[in-house]
Amino acid sequence: MGAQLSTLGHVVLSPVWFLYNLLMKLFQRSTPAITLESPDIKYPLRLIDKEVINHDTRRFRFALPSPQHILGLPVGQHIYLSARIDGNLVIRPYTPVSSDDDKGFVDLVIKVYFKDTHPKFPAGGKMSQYLESMKIGDTIEFRGPNGLLVYQGKGKFAIRPDKKSNPIIKTVKSVGMIAGGTGITPMLQVIRAIIKDPHDPTVCHLLFANQTEKDILLRPELEELRNEHSARFKLWYTVDKAPEAWDYSQGFVNEEMIRDHLPPPEEEPLILMCGPPPMIQYACLPNLDRVGHPKERCFAF
């Protein structure tokens, strides 16, 4: 009798247990584990690969807690890296070039500011040189998500005026972007999010400023996106020092470049900016104003 009850119990419970396991697997598959569970917690992540992109730019790949983890960073947000360097805590913001479509790792493309290369900054960049010195297997602390802007898809941006304010929703048909140097990383994040959705009609216009042609970060990725999605992504460069047979603009961002290569004010686009503060203050904002782009439709990362 006991054996019969045991068998009966097994027969009754097996389908339930099977269904439970199936539901759990489906749930786990649809909701990957998130690394950045709280913006107030630091998460140590291990360096697993370092790629030399050019003379001063590197791609750093860090492992997430498991191959099934995603970073958990909303589009438009950034992370902070923190490390103790020469006895002092150094914290710097960065935007990954990978996304939550990538499981198990996060990629950062970072320009290394070496000492004794820029007369105004003889010590170079503390964090970028620290990253350059890291060996495979070393860890560094990540914290996030952080930032005032989130792209929600289909042209919808949620923007907070400050950290304590509720977000204001702006829905646009086109986005104008001005990036300088490493300021390209948040732009690429938004561009990729828009283009990967075939039902997102938003058009991106990027004006990308650099010192020289060789300083153009992520150029292959940008031009591949432009070539494959020419109706949805417009790309233009300007460099301070142009080589011979240069097909793009030369000089600082100016009114003419904004008129020619960003969407007009009549389209009511959102204008995104990221780059050195002097570029934003003296080149972008005054010339955007001259062209007619209102301040409430301009956002600087």
From Swiss-Prot:
According to its UniProt entry, the protein's GO biological process terms are: cholesterol biosynthetic process; nitric oxide biosynthetic process
Give UniProt keywords alphabetically. Answer: Acetylation, Cholesterol biosynthesis, Cholesterol metabolism, Endoplasmic reticulum, FAD, Flavoprotein, Lipid biosynthesis, Lipid metabolism, Lipoprotein, Membrane, Mitochondrion, Mitochondrion outer membrane, Myristate, NAD, Oxidoreductase, Phosphoprotein, Steroid biosynthesis, Steroid metabolism, Sterol biosynthesis, Sterol metabolism
The name under which this protein is listed is NADH-cytochrome b5 reductase 3
The scientific name of the source species is Canis lupus familiaris (Dog)
Q: What is the documented function of this protein?
A: Catalyzes the reduction of two molecules of cytochrome b5 using NADH as the electron donor.
Compartments it resides in: Endoplasmic reticulum membrane; Mitochondrion outer membrane
* PROSITE patterns referenced in this protein's UniProt entry, alphabetically: FAD_FR
Q: Which residues carry this modification: Phosphotyrosine?
A: 43
Q: Which Gene3D superfamilies match?
A: Nucleotide-binding domain of ferredoxin-NADP reductase (FNR) module, Translation factors
In this chain the FAD-binding FR-type domain maps to 40-152
**Family per record:** Belongs to the flavoprotein pyridine nucleotide cytochrome reductase family.
Residues annotated to bind FAD: 92-94, 109, 111, 114, 126-128, 185
Which SUPFAM superfamilies does the record match to this protein? Ferredoxin reductase-like, C-terminal NADP-linked domain, Riboflavin synthase domain-like
Lipid linkage positions (N-myristoyl glycine): 2
One GO MF term: FAD binding
How is the quaternary structure described?
A: Component of a complex composed of cytochrome b5, NADH-cytochrome b5 reductase (CYB5R3) and MTARC2. Interacts with MTLN; the interaction is required to maintain cellular lipid composition and leads to stimulation of mitochondrial respiratory complex I activity.
What are the names of the required cofactors? FAD
Q: What general EC class does the enzyme of this chain belong to?
A: oxidoreductase
Superkingdom is: Eukaryota
Identify the EC number(s): 1.6.2.2
